[in-house]
Design a protein with these regions (language model features):
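Histidine-acidic metal/acid-base catalytic patches
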Residues: 19, 56-57, 64, 79-102, ...
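Active-site acidic/histidine proton-transfer and metal-coordination neighborhood
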Residues: 1-100
Length: 228
């Protein structure tokens, strides 16, 4: 079922002229994230082998259609942080058909560096979601949500409108420019405490503030000598 659905997706994308499909991969080992009960040696490795066995045939179809798949690094998926992203890419032999959808909101509550991630995986950033999160760790809550609903003030973190959280957006946009990213930048809006018709336009305006034009010449070129 997975192969058939994703193969149809690749063909449909190609028919519409879409060159990048964003989505999730699933994971047969996410339930082992706590590593307890103790994980049998080789079980994690087998999970990445299972991922490759499922996805390489799918990516063959994507290759044939001239379409790329951008996996969103996200809890519950095969790649959910820095090192699991390395492992997922290695499992597929770093084939170009498989890249990443960068969504820094999922980095914030894990204390991952989104800017360093962009640099280290710069050849795999196929799409960017501008989505925001904010931590509220107070010694009584944690990172796993405590089975509390979105927007509950007792949570340790929550999604908020872009510009109201902990993502260093200026650094993100500067790094995107540094790595030569020229793909889509999409505002993905989620905030349990704000009306979307207010929040989404405001988020777009805030993010556009950081999308400034690059310089046409080095700022210190005038001091270089040689030209009058």
């Amino acid at each position: 079922v997975l192969f058939r659905s994703m193969a149809h997706t690749a063909r449909a994308a190609a028919a519409f002229g879409v060159r990048t499909v964003i989505g999730f991969t699933g994971s047969s080992i996410w339930h082992l994230v706590a590593m307890f009960p103790p994980v049998v040696p080789g079980m994690i490795e087998r999970g990445y082998e299972d991922f490759a066995e499922r996805w390489n045939p799918i990516l063959d179809v994507f290759d044939a259609e001239g379409v790329r798949f951008a996996h969103e690094v996200h809890p519950s998926e095969i790649a959910y942080d820095y090192w699991t992203t390395h492992q997922a890419l290695e499992a597929l032999g770093h084939r170009p058909a498989f890249g990443l959808n960068f969504d820094p909101s999922h980095f914030v509550w894990q204390d991952l560096d989104p800017v360093g991630f962009l640099w280290d995986f710069r050849d795999r950033i196929y799409h960017v979601d501008c989505k925001e999160a904010r931590k509220r760790l107070d010694g009584r809550n944690g990172r796993l949500g405590s089975h509390l609903p979105w927007g509950d003030p007792r949570r340790g973190w929550d999604f908020v409108s872009a510009g109201h959280g902990d993502v260093p957006w200026e650094d993100v946009f500067r790094m995107l420019r540094s790595i030569g990213y020229d793909g889509p930048v999409s505002v993905e809006w989620e905030d349990a405490g704000m009306d979307r018709l207010t929040g989404a336009p405001e988020a777009l305006a805030r993010l556009k503030h950081f999308d400034f034009d690059p310089p046409t010449a080095s700022f210190d070129a005038a001091f270089g000598g040689g030209e009058k």
